[in-house]
């Protein structure tokens, strides 16, 4: 069974409003199903944008040094997961690993 992915909207993982999904396959090995992804439409995007606007109103009130600390931690997490992210990008897009590593 492959992994089923969802949209992250307003702090929750949700399916597309239509309930529809699409398959994403490894272009180097078409038999490898990477996962099922939500087939999002305008309504899903509108909901995500609305949630982002509300979140921004709170985020903009966070003092800049605190925002900087949060963004630095996000960067640290991404760096610590660089190899994992590179391998997933290679599987998903068919790029060579050296390129997805940056």
Feature-to-residue mapping (PLM):
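Terminal low-complexity tails and localization/encapsulation signals of metabolic enzymes
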Residues: 1-36, 69, 73
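Glycine-rich loop-to-alpha-helix module at the N-terminal edge of alpha/beta enzyme cores
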Residues: 30-102
């Amino acid at each position: 069974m492959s992994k089923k992915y969802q949209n992250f909207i307003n702090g929750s993982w949700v399916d597309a409003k239509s309930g529809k999904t699409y398959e994403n396959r490894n272009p180097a090995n078409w038999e490898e199903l990477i996962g099922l992804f939500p087939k999002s439409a305008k309504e899903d995007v509108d909901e995500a944008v609305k949630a982002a606007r509300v979140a921004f109103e709170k985020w903009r009130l966070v003092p800049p040094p605190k925002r900087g600390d949060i963004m630095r931690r996000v960067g640290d997490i991404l760096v610590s997961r660089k190899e994992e992210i590179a391998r997933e990008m290679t599987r998903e897009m068919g790029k060579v690993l050296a390129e997805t590593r940056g």
